[in-house]
Amino acid sequence: MLFRSNIKGENSVATQAIRLWLERVRKITKKSIKHWCITERGGNATERIHIHGILWGIGLESLIRETWKYGFIFIGQYVTEKTINYITKYMYKKDEKHPTFTGKVLCSAGIGSQYTTRVDAKNNKYKGENTKETYRCGNGAKIN
């Protein structure tokens, strides 16, 4: 999602836009959309704030296009490790052109909370130098 150039500000503008958008969605659907989004300061000539995100739900495209009022939208129809990596990289992106800008995560409460009850969480519990940090890929392979 991309903001029109006439909207000023940085993360506070994006935070308000997401909040107002979710309120419009809730008014229409009577329920909330589970989401995980992060802001990015654009490069090149525009330097606009972008929001990259993942939205949970089926058939949301027309609803998003109808209710998002803040600029351009690109909607993909899939989520893979590649798309998740693309979106989450903005949490740690070093922007040399805007060194004071830090992306802000905007997400539904409780995303990831079920992880704490999984065996993986116990395996990855902090144990000083003995901490195991294993990631399991979609194909079952483990990365340490």
Q: Which residue ranges define each predicted feature?
A:
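Conserved, short, structured surface segments that act as functional micro-motifs
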Residues: 50
